[in-house]
């Protein structure tokens, strides 16, 4: 039998009597034990990074280069491919070794974090204030809290700049808009014009406006990261070297549970934004890796049948459909030439395989008759049969599959999971904000635990 580092392994102030929280309340028992709470957070980070590394290696082991990523149920390799690792023209995977390296690095990192989590949870000091005052804190210390906020902002800003450096100096990133069907390229001229970058924030979120989700070129994405990274770094320095203003002290609740609620609210917003980005955007989330968007699959089907019937002799410019509108082509509300049929609802779709066929007034008839390239036909046919949809009825005219066809788009997985998680985080935000505000007002201690069913169970030890 091995000797434990800490022979006592006593609860040490983590029991119900001393904290007001029982074991099933988890980290709430550690609210006033900064060292133990550090251990919980480091261990949690270790679990997250372990999942990333293990799942990364799992996807590498199962990856078949001859098939598109979105046909293989992958969600991590598409992210690495979007960063320009291992991919060449057209999104073709030419080297899987960078993916293997990524998985191994994450696994090694998770081991370090896991050790740190166990150490600080069991062996290290329970509180940091006495031995390491720089890392110690009290929740009501407003200056310390904003300093911690500042350090977090600087780290986030550095993370944003990592993408900028990767795109500009270290191999570039994958650009689905590169001529000929996408390629990995260096971003040499990122957009730094604040009117363009912050213009996205001022746009309507509805329809073709699409708020920040409407970003459609890599220059704006990298330029946006330059702005956000710089603002976060300078904002972090500001928060470290200043104290909160009087109105800030009055406006906010300054307690551990309040900070939890703020964090949950922020991550809920990020979950909802990620949901919309993953579902609609085909620049930050290239369709070569994630599969087509819903509008993209619908438009590609209309394009595929236009190509087929044009070859069979149809006059695609004048043919009428069953409603009397154009069967293949029609006019948009603003007078542009667009695809006809049910896909008319997606008339403002933009995609790299379709844009070369547009002119000043929408789709160019001359280009449709003479300039369609084989790669555009192949890509549209592939996207048409991989819509991010189940077998629904109202799907923009996309031919749905029989139930035995087992395809679920990564866009469906990512959008659904981020929406659901964002919603749960938002509910948690409301819950903890309500508790924190009530506690600050002095009239709410929490739910009466006298009737808690768990209290009737035998103690774990």
Swiss-Prot record:
Family the UniProt entry places it in: Belongs to the PsbB/PsbC family. PsbC subfamily.
Membrane topology: Multi-pass membrane protein
Positions of transmembrane segments: 57-81, 122-143, 166-188, 243-263, 279-300, 435-459
Oligomer and partners: PSII is composed of 1 copy each of membrane proteins PsbA, PsbB, PsbC, PsbD, PsbE, PsbF, PsbH, PsbI, PsbJ, PsbK, PsbL, PsbM, PsbT, PsbX, PsbY, PsbZ, Psb30/Ycf12, at least 3 peripheral proteins of the oxygen-evolving complex and a large number of cofactors. It forms dimeric complexes.
Function recorded in the entry: One of the components of the core complex of photosystem II (PSII). It binds chlorophyll and helps catalyze the primary light-induced photochemical processes of PSII. PSII is a light-driven water:plastoquinone oxidoreductase, using light energy to abstract electrons from H(2)O, generating O(2) and a proton gradient subsequently used for ATP formation.
Location in or out of the cell: Plastid, Chloroplast thylakoid membrane
Protein's recorded name: Photosystem II CP43 reaction center protein
Annotated positions of the Phosphothreonine modification: 3
A GO cellular component entry from the record: photosystem II
Superkingdom of the source species: Eukaryota
Organism listed in the record: Stigeoclonium helveticum (Green alga)
A Pfam cross-reference name: PSII
Residues annotated to bind [CaMn4O5] cluster: 355
Keywords: Acetylation, Chlorophyll, Chloroplast, Chromophore, Manganese, Membrane, Metal-binding, Phosphoprotein, Photosynthesis, Photosystem II, Plastid, Thylakoid, Transmembrane, Transmembrane helix
Entry-annotated residues carrying N-acetylthreonine: 3
GO molecular function terms listed in the Swiss-Prot or TrEMBL record: chlorophyll binding; electron transporter, transferring electrons within the cyclic electron transport pathway of photosynthesis activity; metal ion binding
Gene: psbC
Residues excised as propeptide: 1-2
Record's cofactor remark: Binds multiple chlorophylls and provides some of the ligands for the Ca-4Mn-5O cluster of the oxygen-evolving complex. It may also provide a ligand for a Cl- that is required for oxygen evolution. PSII binds additional chlorophylls, carotenoids and specific lipids.
GO BP, one annotated term: photosynthetic electron transport in photosystem II
Subcellular location, principal: plastid
